[in-house]
């Protein structure tokens, strides 16, 4: 029993001694220097120099040679540098460490102005920075790595977006790739400075502002393809899109603008004069336009259904008159003529006449040609300089009037139009001048309201026929009469 207790006590003593030794090793020994010791160190260095550190350390009781050397180079010597390191010093430090290893005293001799402790601390800092940059570069390489599980799409602006094949369906990937422009599909957009990117998505394109000539005769089909905007969809094959874009200096745009100015000036002239002679002069202007257009070979750009523009001109005159005069005195009472022996019916007003179709196509075509020849013979030699409405330059530039210019000479004439006429293709033309009555719906009246309105307007019997020009609606009064 006594032996066992002795052994246990011996073990406890050994543990206590080991613990005390470890605690002493873990304790940091801080060396302090007093001002008196610093003065002694300076005096000994001035006498012995910086080579005999053992003699200098013997003058102190608790200072070693290493401590004396560090105190001198780190704090007391003014020749050593303090502060940041330059790139040249970092390069020299790395080269010296590669040659001498971790012998910092030798490295400090190479790197002038730095102590061995400063050299060691700087090298440790450089190693930490290098490890940090290598870790960041490794992360960037992993992120930019392309593998089968994580695919990236590179956009033209340099942005890459990962797409996972497992989580997305083929339809989703197709939709996300549909808006990415293909570099081979980037074409020049005419003569403009920007480019046009043709997307692979199926979009409805609007036809350009162009004139469609149906009965124009040309030597080859290239000119018709330039005038007609024909957009074709490509099904995996290379098919060129045929589009027409009018430039600012195009003769067609100039002709359209001159035609608008012509109609406006004619309407103002007729409204200002307010006589039958001014109306006849206006029709002579239109006839002269046709002659000029045929001479200049600009008629091939004309629109076949241009007769609606003549009605629009008369509607414009009527609207100007109704805005300046009183409503009761400005509107002319229509003369209704309905002969049972003929199939022609006309209802004339101050703004124009209603044109009805004739059952026989050959006779009406002959009548139209006779009317045109007589009007050309009568008005071919007359000029417009006396009226001062439009100049010769304007007459030469405008070539967009059809044969419907000589439909009427005054508001009471009626000219039939063939009921059946064959065209190569349907005409789809945006009207150049829309009437304000286009957006007004036709009213519905009862029998008593209809009779009251007829008596108020001075009309004995209602018009049994609606308007014969469905493409362009007549003014408000004719809409009201036709609805009754």
Swiss-Prot record:
Motif Nuclear localization signal: positions: 13-20
Alphabetical list of InterPro entries matching this protein = Homeodomain-like_sf, Myb_dom, MYB_TF, SANT/Myb
Which residue ranges does the record assign to the HTH myb-type domain? 25-76, 77-131
What GO terms in the biological process aspect are recorded for it? embryo sac development; guard cell differentiation; guard mother cell cytokinesis; guard mother cell differentiation; lateral root development; megasporogenesis; multicellular organismal-level water homeostasis; positive regulation of lateral root development
Q: Where is this region: Disordered?
A: 1-20, 215-241, 321-383, 458-484
Q: Where is the composition biased (Polar residues)?
A: 354-380
Q: From which domain of life does this come?
A: Eukaryota
Phenotype of the disruptant? Double mutants flp-7 myb88 and flp-1 myb88 have strong defects in stomata repartition with large stomatal clusters formation. Increased accumulation of CDKB1-1 in the double mutant flp-1 myb88. Double mutants flp-1 myb88 have increased susceptibility to drought and high salt (NaCl), as well as increased rates of water loss; these phenotypes are associated with reduced accumulation of many typical abiotic stress gene transcripts. Lower stomatal closure in response to abscisic acid (ABA) treatment. Accumulation of CYCA2-3 in newly formed guard cells in flp-1 myb88 double mutant.
DNA-binding region(s) in UniProt: 53-76, 104-127
Q: Which Pfam families match?
A: Myb_DNA-bind_6 (PF13921)
What subcellular compartments does it reside in?
Answer: Nucleus
For bias type Pro residues, the affected ranges are 463-476
Recorded GO cellular component terms are:
nucleus
**Protein name (Swiss-Prot/TrEMBL):** Transcription factor MYB88
Q: Which gene encodes it?
A: MYB88
